[in-house]
Amino acid sequence: MADRVRRPEYKHGVLVVYIAALFVQVLDATIVNVALPALAEEFAVSVTEVDAAAIAFSVALAVSIPPAGWLSDRYGSKTIFLGSLALFTAASALCGAAATLDQLVAFRILQGVGAGLITPVGSAMLFRAFPLEERAVAANAVLSVAVIAPAMGPVVGGAIVDNASWRWIFFINVPIGVVALVLGALWLRNDESAPAGRFDVPGFVLSSLGLAGVVFAVSIAPDVGWLDPLTLVCGLGGLAAFAVLVPLQLRLDNPLLHLGLFRERLFRTFNLVGIFFYAGFIGLLIVLTLYLQTHRGYSAFEAGLTQAPQAVGVFLLSNLAGRRLYRRFGPRPMFIGGTFGALVFTGVLVFVSASTPLWLIGAFMFLRGVSVGTVFLPMQTAIYSNIADAQLSRA
């Protein structure tokens, strides 16, 4: 009886641990951006130069995602999940202690590797733990964290930068990460999965070159220009690597990337659309926060507060969607309606000017959050709805 009190049902244990890990990972993606001016001042460089730390994180995260499924199948999902969370947590502490910009960039690379493994391995564990009919509930809980945490990042980061040291935007990850590690060690288990087979080295090299090239090109283009030689070389080089990678992966019996999964219509559609949707969601948070600080003179905390209404909108609609709308209408109408609303209110925010009051920006952010909250639940649930449990780690 005592053991039953201490240990939750397995699926709930997976949910708690994954949500905690996802929270610090997603929070970190936006909490750092509000501190870029403070980091530039600390290291006596421009904001553009400090952005190298963010670019390093993004590239490392992208490169570490493709091998996540193979590593999970080969060494066990619990082992890889806790190992990646430990790496992310330790790297967060090192980032907070960084004495130079070069050190910060190096430690952000380690952070990115850990972060890139957490989400695919953790989400596969979660959807294996929940039966198909309960996955909408699990997806709703994950959604609340995945969308609210980025909106909280600028608020929390702004408060930290204005009232403490920038180092705490990294140190804040450590206690949450440690708690998640302890609970994960107690509650998680290695799932059964398909045999890992041999590691696809050519696939890993090509996917790394492709992802690193494209992510790096997209990251630097706003500063140096889309036609800059470096942007073109990296971007086109990355696309060329993908052009070689795709037919190679389709020919192999045990590829690193199981591209055959994209034959499943829902998986293909929601993955491809979701890439652009989430990029736009995070991108506006970053741009708006920096604009309010550097062009309108608001403090980091004030700039971060403009993101709070969006978090409220997401929370309200994601919970309503989870309980009623998804059961009644299914994923397609919700996704189309929410996407239309998100596009409209994102477009409105593009025209924010020096005379636009903060309350109006906040109102549009709330409406954008309402739209986004309607989209992410059906997208998250439908992606894995027709994928066999044995293939979830590769999906």
Functional labels for PLM-detected ranges:
Residues D3-K11, G96, A196, V224, ...:
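Helix-boundary and loop/linker segments of multi-pass membrane transporters
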Residues H12-V34, V47-F57, P67-G69, P202, ...:
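12-transmembrane solute porter fold
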Residues Q25, A54-F57, L61, F88, ...:
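Structural signature of transmembrane alpha-helices in multi-pass secondary transporters
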Residues L36-L39, G122-L126, I160, L188, ...:
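Hydrophobic alpha-helical interface/terminus motif in multipass membrane transporters
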Residues L39-A40, L71-S72, L104, V156-A164, ...:
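Interfacial helix-cap and linker-helix signal at transmembrane-aqueous boundaries
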Residues I65-G203, S355, D389:
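Helix-loop-helix hairpins in multi-pass membrane proteins, especially solute transporters
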Residues L87-A97, G114, I176-L183, G210, ...:
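Transmembrane-helix signature of multi-pass solute transporters
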Residues D162-V273, G280, Y298, T306:
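Hydrophobic transmembrane-helix bundles of small-molecule transporters
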